[in-house]
Regions:
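Sensory/regulatory domains in signal-transduction proteins
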Residues: 32, 37-143
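Short helix-to-turn junction characteristic of helix-turn-helix DNA-binding domains
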Residues: 174-178, 217
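PAS-family sensory modules
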Residues: 1-32, 126-169, 228-232, 242-245
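Basic, Lys/Arg-enriched C-terminal extension of HTH/homeodomain DNA-binding domains
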Residues: 202-245
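Recognition helix of helix-turn-helix DNA-binding domains
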Residues: 177-212
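A cross-family signal for key residues in well-ordered alpha-helices
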Residues: 172, 185, 215
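Hydrophobic residues on short alpha-helical segments
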Residues: 171-172, 202
Length: 245
């Protein structure tokens, strides 16, 4: 492939870094985020969809910048991203993460991000490729320890008014097999308050205990709701579907 068929970004990052123009053409019009970083986690390329996800202008010059240098809420997770990228380079395998952030607004959004080693013509790893996609479905086992592993769509908005907001928070922890004491500690409440809320929840669901409540939640497809008050922005490395050496 001749030099005219490549995009040369030498000088914007450590060493020579060439991106085949075919990759740029393949990614630029896609509605899913794609990009490349060098081995120092500096951006070499990011497609318009990634800039849009971060609410950055289309002409924003991202090349040569670190995540920590971007004017976005995810900047505070730069060190975690770098750890992820070094792990990809070391293991020479795809490693995925679940990203839950207020990417560009007030509402939480969830994305899966896959990171792959970027290998040059000499077989050396010189960075990472990333690809993001909306996390419409995740295995409940990622956050619910109930034994139900069927993928369900994530919901950040209350799926039903059968329970109050306070009761939904209790349901969330109950699905993870938290004891009443553990739920009370997590929510900063007295155990008696949790007991009263569970009684109210059981009554509304017309069940007599936790096992029946779990079945009720699963049968009505309510287990995919994560109360926003319990959410924190985060970068969670996953092992679902990854290759193992």
């Amino acid at each position: 492939m001749s030099e005219k068929d490549r995009i040369d970004l030498h000088g914007r990052s450590q060493g020579d870094f060439h991106i085949p123009v075919e990759l740029i053409h393949s990614w630029k019009d896609l509605n899913e985020p794609f990009g490349i970083k060098d081995s120092y986690s500096r951006f070499i390329y990011a497609n318009p969809a990634y800039l849009e996800l971060l609410n950055l202008p289309k002409d924003f010059d991202i090349v040569g910048r670190l995540d920590s240098e971007l004017p976005t809420p995810i900047a505070e997770f730069a060190e975690q991203f770098q750890y992820h990228e070094r792990k990809v380079e070391m293991e020479r395998q795809r490693i995925s993460s679940l990203e839950i952030h207020r990417f560009s607004g007030n509402e939480f959004r969830a994305y899966f991000f896959d990171r792959y080693p970027y290998i040059n013509q000499d077989g050396h790893i010189i960075g990472t490729i990333f690809h993001g996609r909306v996390a419409e479905f995740i295995p409940l086992s990622c956050y619910v320890q109930s034994g139900f592993n069927d993928p369900q769509p994530i919901l950040f908005k209350k799926p039903s008014d059968i329970f109050t907001d306070a009761e939904w928070s209790v349901v969330f922890f109950a699905l993870q097999n938290f004891s009443q004491k553990e739920i009370a500690t997590s929510l900063g409440l007295k155990q008696k308050t949790i007991n009263n809320r569970l009684d109210s929840i059981y009554k509304k669901a017309r069940v007599s205990g936790l096992c029946q409540l779990i079945n009720y939640i699963m049968e009505n497809k309510l287990a995919n709701y994560i109360p926003e008050r319990l959410l924190r922005s985060g970068h969670y490395i996953m092992n679902i579907g990854q290759n193992k050496k």
